[in-house]
């Protein structure tokens, strides 16, 4: 089974060809440099960039692969920026019509969960953590077609908060890799408190964000690196606390972590100790990518056959 996966939900344009579970190749173009001066993604600009980038990737794809060999075309249906999603859908639809291949709509967040399947096998039931710039949630997964959200952020996503704190500290964009690097060099010792939520598996990252911003605003001699490292430690403490509870409640056979923030070095180190079978995607499959869309389509098609 050969599947083309198309991802365009935010600011990465990516396409990948998957044969069964093997990634034949993946082509991606990022818009980070385009949005860097704004300190975040501008939806209208993102849509225009997707139009340009998806045509570049198509040209590269045709040079590498005979599209007539495809069995299915999978694309990100939701969630994401409306305009960006529409570009991916129109591109997928045009290919579907011209090649007479079936379209498979894929949920972007589920794809982040299943990205670990590219190199690992998920044992079910599983608890899944998806952490990215736009989303933070915990899944309980019985099988490929049964994903239940048992915890989610009530406000900001963790990646969004990393960007805001980084911007407040004048460290740059995107904030996640910058703060991760700083935290690998020093251990912060500022004590920020972990927010409480009504549902015990939900998150409130804005509570941490507000504490850190207030600390920055009220500090006369600000140690930027200490603040950055202390902020990261608090957020990982928070996530670890929630996952320990989820594992205790649901007794999973796997703990699966996905999304852009899953590339964080300290997060990987800390969460690896929580369960005997902890799965992370390879670093190239943590950010938004076409391979995770294709593998999700493959798994769902296999399950239904």
Curated annotation (Swiss-Prot):
Known EC number: 2.3.1.234
Binding residue positions for Fe cation: 108, 112, 288
Recorded GO MF terms: iron ion binding; N(6)-L-threonylcarbamoyladenine synthase activity
The family this protein is said to belong to: Belongs to the KAE1 / TsaD family.
InterPro entries tied to this protein: ATPase_NBD, Gcp-like_dom, KAE1/TsaD, TsaD
HAMAP family named in the record: TsaD (MF_01445)
Gene designation: tsaD
Compartments it resides in: Cytoplasm
Enzyme's top EC category: transferase
Superkingdom classification of source: Bacteria
Known function: Required for the formation of a threonylcarbamoyl group on adenosine at position 37 (t(6)A37) in tRNAs that read codons beginning with adenine. Is involved in the transfer of the threonylcarbamoyl moiety of threonylcarbamoyl-AMP (TC-AMP) to the N6 group of A37, together with TsaE and TsaB. TsaD likely plays a direct catalytic role in this reaction.
Residues annotated as binding substrate: 130-134, 163, 176, 180, 264
One Pfam family named in its UniProt record: TsaD
Keywords of this entry: Acyltransferase, Cytoplasm, Iron, Metal-binding, Transferase, tRNA processing
Protein name: tRNA N6-adenosine threonylcarbamoyltransferase
Cofactor notes: Binds 1 Fe(2+) ion per subunit.
GO cellular component: cytoplasm
GO biological process: tRNA threonylcarbamoyladenosine modification
Needed cofactors: Fe(2+)
Reactions this protein catalyses: L-threonylcarbamoyladenylate + adenosine(37) in tRNA = N(6)-L-threonylcarbamoyladenosine(37) in tRNA + AMP + H(+)
Keyword Metal-binding listed: yes
Record's signal peptide: none
